[in-house]
Regions:
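Sec/Tat signal peptide C-region and signal peptidase I cleavage site
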Residues: 19-23
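Extracytoplasmic "Venus flytrap"
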Residues: 28-50, 58, 71-78, 100-103, ...
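Beta-alpha junction/loop-to-helix N-cap segments that form part of ligand/metal-binding clefts
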Residues: 42-49, 57-129, 141, 195-202, ...
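Venus flytrap/periplasmic-binding-protein-like
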Residues: 73, 120, 124-130, 197-198, ...
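Extracellular/periplasmic Venus flytrap/periplasmic-binding protein
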Residues: 82, 127-130, 135-236, 270-281
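Periplasmic-binding protein-like
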Residues: 87, 91-100, 120-122, 165-168, ...
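Extracellular/periplasmic periplasmic-binding protein-like sensory domains
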Residues: 230-302, 313-316, 356, 366-387
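Segments of small-molecule ligand-sensing domains
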Residues: 288-298, 309-367, 379
């Protein structure tokens, strides 16, 4: 077992921060700061597992002795900010990988980047960090949040839907989701409801949908909200109305949704059956190690580790300016295939319409139906003045 793998095994098992690090030019320290407890834990666990899988395959990232410290942000901005600060200032983290949620990204970006570290998000992609608040030391291996919703709006537009019912929880991400959908959908809106955060009973909303009989429904209902909505949608006999979604039916929720989600649609930058050699190898290795189908969070964590390795090798070490310059060139082969960074350090990549299928082995997964956007850059990049 390599030194890297020994350190991963020791450090990934705990959320406690390590003792102060000695500055060593030949040692890389990576902090992995993700939501690993509470309702959002399944997403953080997937991102962590994908990252650690790639790190184990790589061995020594960039040919350097590698120390990986895994920390739980508890999905609390104040906790996350303190732990990010400790990772950089106390533990000497050169790079912090995280977070899952956008409000956590807002809390940790300053402690990491002003403390001298580089922040690489394997999921969160808030509009401000893609636009006016972009930073040289912030990168995302995921997407800008609006893009998944734009995929579904474009699909609805292409299908000629004229009467779509919109559903999302009443908080900023929910409001942004429906706004993103409308950026690429110009048809009529049958109804628009913002539900309570954490709501689990959708009988009233489903009754309205049944009465209105819209051309389709678009929903953004992440986590347990999505599990319940999908089950109740099927139980209400509404499966004849196309169900379009983002962050509602994916590999994180499908084990609980199962047959109820079959045939439902989602927007994504990836699916387990994306046809690249790197993706086939990743999915096989992930399932062999963890026993379940990887989700987009796992893929983005996996790509983050491979990006770091490639940039370190190109930069020749952890010098911050050289490493940022190397990261900008995206010197790795993504499991997604084509991948580059825009001027705001967010990916330029393809986006797909996916649907839920049951594989021959009985497991549920998303599957690509068609490509919606090719080499798509987010709408906020033009507002980024990197400084």
């Amino acid at each position: 077992m390599t030194q890297t793998r020994s350190l991963i095994a020791a450090l990934a098992a705990t959320t406690a921060l390590a003792a102060p690090a000695m500055a060593q030019d030949d040692t890389l320290t990576v902090g992995v700061l993700l939501t690993l407890s509470g309702p959002g834990a399944v997403l953080g666990e997937m991102a962590r597992d994908g990252f650690l899988l790639a790190a184990e395959e790589i061995g020594e990232m960039g040919g350097m002795e590698t120390r990986i410290i895994v920390v739980d942000d508890e999905q609390k901005p104040d906790v996350a900010a303190n732990k990010a600060r400790e990772l950089v200032e106390r533990n000497g983290a050169d790079i912090v990988v995280g977070p899952i949620f956008s409000n956590i990204a807002g809390a940790i970006v300053q402690p990491v980047t002003q403390g001298g570290g580089i922040l690489i998000s394997p999921n969160a992609g808030p509009s401000n960090l893609a636009g006016a608040d972009c930073k040289p030391a912030f990168f995302a291996t995921s997407y800008q949040n609006d893009q998944m919703h734009e995929v579904m709006g474009a699909h609805a537009q292409a299908q000629g839907f004229q009467n779509v019912f919109l559903l999302a929880p009443n908080y900023q991400a929910g409001q942004d989701a429906l706004a993103g959908f409308k950026k690429s959908y110009t048809g009529g809106v049958a109804g628009e409801i913002f539900t309570q955060m954490g709501q689990l009973d959708y009988s009233a909303e489903l009754a309205q949908i049944a009465a209105m009989q819209p051309d389709a429904v678009f929903a953004f209902m992440p986590g347990g909200m999505g599990v319940n909505l999908v089950r109740q949608y099927r139980q209400a006999g509404l499966e004849g109305i196309p169900f379009l979604s983002a962050f509602t039916v994916d590999e994180a929720t499908l084990p609980a949704q199962a047959e109820a989600a079959l045939g439902f649609f989602a927007g994504s930058n990836w699916a387990p059956d994306l046809d690249t050699p790197e993706n086939a190898a990743f999915v096989a290795a992930y399932e062999a190690k963890y026993g379940h189908v990887p989700g987009v969070y796992a893929m983005q964590g996996y790509d983050a580790a491979r990006l770091i390795d490639g940039a370190l090798r190109e930069a020749g070490g952890t010098d911050r300016d050289a490493l940022i310059a190397a990261l900008e060139g995206a010197p790795f082969t993504s499991v997604r295939g084509d991948f580059s960074f825009g001027p705001n350090h967010f990916p330029i990549q393809d986006f797909y319409l996916t649907t839920v299928v049951q594989r021959e082995d009985g497991k549920f997964a998303t599957s690509i139906v068609e490509k919606i956007f090719d080499d798509y850059q987010d709408n906020y990049a033009a507002n980024c003045q990197m400084n």
